[in-house]
């Protein structure tokens, strides 16, 4: 029978009449009404209300949290919480409270939990797994008790009475709490409590007076699931593996070193998945050698190591920042022992490690700005490609790391201004070009990094003022030119960053006054001249920066009163005109260049009433005429007189 005592304190007492024992459990207030619905028959006694379980229990809705990595509080489906975050919060609460018990009230409702739940908690599990504490291991779920016994041995010898750990089973996170409890009668109890956030944060506890008894328990003994979850339990708890990541203060973690070295997990995809996730590099290295003896189908299954939501093990390793795991996978596959053991299709499937949304592991690493993982992948790729005879198209496809919308991964890097990550990728390209025979078209396509709509990443970088992105590309071009034949026109096409829309990247930079972007390009002009044989034909498009309607970015800068931009453009022409072979006629052609509206730059400035800019254009022309010695040029004299005459007039709108 079941009874409820002191209803205002939300406690239930479970009475086992056969063994004459009782167990009191505090429940969260939000679950009280569900308990009342499940057990609705009460007596009239106020101090002791007896409840009987109805036979139609299966027809009732229980406050369950689904095993898909997310939980929903009943009645409030918009309040979604990721279950592993709750598991991490449990551990956090354990160490923040003297009694080592989470405050039940913090978990009593969606509102209270969200108040209690801080922003750092999202990274709490990631930080715990990524820190790879001593004593972590992957074991068969049936050996769960064996691991607990090993922990108890270390705890007892080091005088520690309480520890906790996160458990990863498939895509599901739980927490376990171990406690050595000395009773007043002089007995020692070893208590293992597993908290399962997917089952309303209840716990299942097993207590024993002997450590030897603990080791006989499997993880399934601690699972509290209803009928709808039995298949998941049978698939992933009974016959699979569990990763156990201890959560102890740093000064105590060292005591777990060597505690589970003798635990050997079963050879299965689930084991591989968890080994990659928690960073067990030593065990993984040994398994990679064993895999060479397997048939290809089983070998591929082991190396992809999917969990039940189709996340590959390599993807999880990248997600948790396990660069050494990534390096082990790539380097092991690069060894001659693996040559010919995998088809190219299966190999690329393993290396790409895509999630269900089509995002590859490389895409994830670059998006997370994980330089170590990206460096490990790029460093290992040339040898791996040589071992398995990958062609340039396969390597190009891997490097572009397109998602389902066909956007290049470098598009997001450039758009977000992540210059450091871009530099890592571009620095790896020369070796990849040599070893994998990437073509000029493939390399330029990587540099343009267009999205699904054909918009280059450099367009977004220039539009947003990310001059560091432009600088990294300009600095990488000379070394790339040593490997492939990049022409001056290719560079102009790259730097103007034309999109399928009306504008170009350089046009937008001038319009918005991003001086850092413009200066970066113009400062690189001498290098472009020396390396790519730039001439005046190549320089003029950069100075004008026309959009698709042939409207110059210089004119747009004038229209938007970007005086610094205008001054920089004319100064760049003045500084580099001789280097690029400009003649007096070329200079006058530039000054008299007209937009589709039939205005020159000076006329446009005058038309919009920007007198300061108009005077700047005139003064720059006069200085260049003196410097280049064409003060007697008829075109110059006529243009000078025309501009001076306009400036003397009080009102605009008198343009010829």
What is each residue range found by the language model?
Residues 16-198, 203-263:
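Cysteine-dependent deubiquitinase/ubiquitin-like isopeptidase catalytic cores across multiple families
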Residues 274-275, 314, 362, 410, ...:
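Conserved hydrophobic residue in the first alpha-helix
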Residues 277-278, 317, 365, 413, ...:
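Ankyrin-repeat helical register
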Residues 281-282, 321, 369, 417, ...:
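Ankyrin-repeat intra-repeat helix-capping/turn positions
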Residues 286, 324-325, 372-373, 420-421, ...:
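Conserved ankyrin/ankyrin-like repeat signature
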Residues 289-301, 330-349, 378-397, 426-445, ...:
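Ankyrin repeat domain, specifically the short helix-to-loop turn at the C-terminus of the second helix
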Residues 306-307, 354-355, 402-404, 450-451, ...:
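Ankyrin repeat boundary/linker residues
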């Amino acid at each position: 029978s079941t009874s409820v005592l002191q209803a205002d304190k939300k406690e239930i007492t479970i009475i086992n009449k056969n063994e004459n024992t009782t167990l009191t459990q505090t429940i969260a207030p939000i679950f009280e009404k569900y308990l009342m619905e499940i057990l609705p028959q009460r007596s009239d006694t106020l101090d002791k209300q007896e409840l009987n379980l109805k036979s139609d229990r299966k027809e009732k809705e229980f406050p369950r949290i689904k095993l898909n990595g997310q939980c929903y509080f009943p009645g409030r489906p918009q309040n979604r919480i990721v279950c592993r975050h709750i598991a991490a919060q449990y551990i956090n609460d354990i160490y923040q409270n003297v009694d080592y018990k989470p405050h039940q009230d913090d978990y009593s409702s969606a509102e209270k939990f969200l108040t209690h739940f801080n922003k750092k908690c999202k990274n709490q599990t990631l930080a715990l797994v990524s820190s790879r504490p001593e004593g972590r291991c992957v074991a068969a779920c049936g050996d769960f008790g064996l691991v607990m016994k090993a922990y108890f041995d270390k705890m007892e010898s080091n005088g520690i009475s309480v520890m906790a750990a996160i458990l990863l089973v498939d895509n599901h996170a739980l927490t376990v709490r171990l406690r050595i409890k000395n009773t007043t009668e002089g007995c020692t109890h070893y208590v293992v409590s597993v908290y399962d956030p997917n089952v309303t944060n209840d716990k299942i506890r097993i207590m024993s007076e002997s450590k030897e008894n603990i080791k006989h328990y499997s993880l399934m003994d601690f699972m509290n699931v209803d009928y709808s979850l039995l298949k998941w339990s049978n698939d992933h708890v009974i016959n699979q593996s569990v990763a156990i990541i201890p959560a102890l203060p740093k000064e105590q973690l060292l005591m777990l070193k060597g505690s589970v070295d003798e635990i050997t997990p079963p050879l299965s995809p689930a084991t591989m998945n968890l080994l990659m996730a928690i960073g067990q590099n030593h065990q993984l290295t040994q398994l990679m050698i064993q895999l060479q003896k397997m048939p290809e189908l089983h070998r591929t299954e082991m190396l992809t190591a999917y969990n039940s939501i189709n996340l590959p093990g390599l993807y999880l390793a990248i997600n948790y920042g396990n660069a050494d795991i990534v390096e082990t996978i790539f380097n092991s596959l690069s060894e001659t022992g693996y040559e010919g053991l995998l088809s190219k299709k299966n190999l690329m499937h393993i290396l790409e490690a895509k999630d269900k949304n089509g995002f590859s592991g490389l895409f994830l690493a670059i998006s997370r700005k994980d330089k170590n993982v990206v460096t490990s992948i790029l460093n290992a790729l040339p040898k791996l490609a040589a071992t398995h005879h990958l062609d340039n198209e396969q390597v190009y496809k891997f490097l572009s790391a397109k998602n389902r919308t066909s956007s290049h991964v470098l598009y997001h890097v450039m758009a977000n201004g992540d210059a450091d990550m871009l530099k890592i990728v571009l620095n790896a390209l020369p070796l990849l070009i040599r070893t994998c025979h990437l073509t000029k078209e493939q390399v330029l396509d990587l540099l343009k990094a267009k999205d699904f709509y054909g918009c280059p990443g450099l367009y977004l970088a220039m539009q947003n003022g990310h001059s560091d992105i432009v600088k990294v590309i300009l600095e990488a071009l000379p070394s790339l030119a040593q490997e492939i034949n990049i022409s001056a026109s290719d560079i102009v096409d790259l730097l103007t960053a034309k999109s399928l829309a009306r504008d170009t990247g350089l046009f937008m930079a001038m319009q918005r006054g991003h001086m850092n972007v413009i200066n970066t390009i113009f400062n690189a002009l001498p290098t472009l001249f020396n390396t790519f044989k730039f001439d005046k034909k190549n320089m003029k498009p950069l100075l004008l920066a026309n959009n698709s309607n042939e409207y110059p970015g210089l004119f747009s800068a004038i229209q938007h009163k970007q005086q610094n931009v205008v001054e920089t453009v004319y100064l760049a022409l003045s500084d580099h005109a001789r280097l690029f072979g400009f003649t007096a006629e070329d200079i006058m052609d530039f000054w008299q260049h007209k937009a589709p509206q039939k205005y020159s730059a000076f006329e446009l400035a005058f038309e919009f009433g920007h007198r300061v800019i108009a005077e700047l254009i005139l003064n720059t022309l006069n200085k260049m005429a003196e410097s280049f010695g064409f003060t007697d040029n008829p075109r110059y004299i006529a243009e000078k007189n025309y501009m001076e005459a306009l400036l003397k007039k009080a009102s605009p709108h008198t343009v010829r």
